[in-house]
């Protein structure tokens, strides 16, 4: 079911009973640690400290910049078309990709940036290994920014999920914290003693998917409290490091293993193993519809649909 590696491979478009099929496999020259879709035909890659653009149609990779001085851990596309990147050099950069220019370099964290998410009103929120989550606000006319600390935890903050009611969930060690962005106060928390939490992602129905260090996947229902709505059966054996939602509401997860898993929240007892990579999967991104991309330490980028 997977594509072979080491050369460019395209597969004919069998629907495979609705399960993802590898449509394209591209060999990479560098290890890629982060990935985001710019549009349905272009991906932005974080290849160590270099930002690159991959054109799916031409199957070509173009360097953008190596402004970061450390590995790029996270990339997101902002609603205004710009790109935000977080790095092991402790900085966040905002990019105009068309001009290949850095618009802002955000200084304030004292350790690795693990995650970035966009907020309403020209803001982003970051999660860092310095145990702090910061909110950053931009003044585009003055080309300035301000920031404040939302949470100062006792452990590193690895991930952020942004909810529709002006609230966020922070993943820190074995705890999940619910914060109100208006009051800047913690409203609730959930202790997950076994495995700890690495990644949280908001879903289109308002729930939140949680990936644990022991390979388990949870779905949370968010009220005034954080309530575990669904516990999926054991699929991964190692830390879940990425979660994406497809337009059909199914979830795809990757872990410190070489296989992906497709999950259906409506049928939590079922799972589908997606094989094709030969080494640990480092990053995963949604493209459009049921199309997504993955990158592995086997130095291949694969497009699935």
Language-model features, listed with the residues they occupy:
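A short beta-strand motif characteristic of beta-propeller blades
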Residues: 21-26, 60-65, 101-106, 143-150, ...
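Short loop/turn segments that connect beta-strands within beta-propeller blades
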Residues: 56-59, 97-100, 138-141, 181-184, ...
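A short helix->beta-strand "capping" segment at the edge of beta-propeller domains
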Residues: 10-30
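Short coil/turn segments within WD40 beta-propeller repeats
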Residues: 49-52, 70-73, 89-93, 111-114, ...
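Beta-strand-rich domains and repeat architectures in extracellular enzymes and scaffolds
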Residues: 25-49
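WD40/WD-repeat beta-propeller blade N-cap
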Residues: 25-32, 65-72, 106-113, 150-157, ...
């Amino acid at each position: 079911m997977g594509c072979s590696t080491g050369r460019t491979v395209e597969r004919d478009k069998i629907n495979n009973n609705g399960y993802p099929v590898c449509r394209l496999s591209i060999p990479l020259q560098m290890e890629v640690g982060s990935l985001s879709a710019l549009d349905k035909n272009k991906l932005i890659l974080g290849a160590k400290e270099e930002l690159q653009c991959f054109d799916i149609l031409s199957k070509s990779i173009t360097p953008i910049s190596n402004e970061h001085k450390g590995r790029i851990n996270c990339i997101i596309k902002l609603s205004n078309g710009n790109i935000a990147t977080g790095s092991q050099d402790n900085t966040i950069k905002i990019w105009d990709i068309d001009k290949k220019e850095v618009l802002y370099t955000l200084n304030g964290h004292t350790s690795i940036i693990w995650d970035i998410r966009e907020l309403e009103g020209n803001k982003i929120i970051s999660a860092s290994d310095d145990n702090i989550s910061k909110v950053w606000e931009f003044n585009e006319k003055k080309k300035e920014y301000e920031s404040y600390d939302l949470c100062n935890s006792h452990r590193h903050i690895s991930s952020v999920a942004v909810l529709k009611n002006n609230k966020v969930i922070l993943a820190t060690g074995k705890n999940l914290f619910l914060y109100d962005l208006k009051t800047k106060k913690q409203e609730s928390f959930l202790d997950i003693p076994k495995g700890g939490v690495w990644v949280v992602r908001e879903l289109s129905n308002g729930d939140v998917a949680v990936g644990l260090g022991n390979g388990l996947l949870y779905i949370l229902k968010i009220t005034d409290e954080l309530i575990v709505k669904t516990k999926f059966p054991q699929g991964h054996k190692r830390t879940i490091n990425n979660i994406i939602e497809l337009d059909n509401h199914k979830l795809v997860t990757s872990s410190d293993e070489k296989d992906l898993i497709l999950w259906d929240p409506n049928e939590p007892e079922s799972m589908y193993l997606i094989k094709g990579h030969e080494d640990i999967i480092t990053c995963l991104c949604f493209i459009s519809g049921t199309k997504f991309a993955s990158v592995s330490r086997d130095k291949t980028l694969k497009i699935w649909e």
